[in-house]
Amino acid sequence: MKLSFLSLALAIIFVTVLIYAPQAEAKALADAVADADADADAAADAVADALADADAFKIPWGKIKDFVTGGIKEVAKG
């Protein structure tokens, strides 16, 4: 008797999955498109903010390069 209840429960789950899978897939695709649009907007905003911040703050690339190359030379010695 337990086997028949288990079979019935599995059959109900299987049928439910078959019925609702296309709806869930369509919703997931629509959500993915909306998420991609939102991510693109967020990325564009982040780039614009980074460029604005870079203009406002002058980065001493020469000093950074000297620091990094000096560290690499010390590691190579050691």
From Swiss-Prot:
Expressed by the venom gland. One of its GO terms (molecular function) is toxin activity. It comes from the Eukaryota. Residues 27-56 form a propeptide. The keyword Hydrolase does not apply. Keywords: Amidation, Antimicrobial, Secreted, Signal, Toxin. The keyword Secreted applies. Residues 1-26 form the signal peptide. GO terms for cellular component: extracellular region. InterPro entries: Pilosulin. The modification Lysine amide is found at K77. It is found in: Secreted. It holds the Pfam family Pilosulin. Peptide with toxicity towards insects that may also act as antimicrobial peptide. Causes calcium influx in F11 cells (EC(50)=5.8 nM), possibly by modulating sodium channels (Nav). In vivo, is lethal to insects, but does not show toxicity to vertebrates. Intraplantar injection into mice does not induce spontaneous nocifensive behaviors up to a dose of 200 pmol. Belongs to the formicidae venom precursor-01 superfamily. This is Myrmicitoxin-Ta2a.
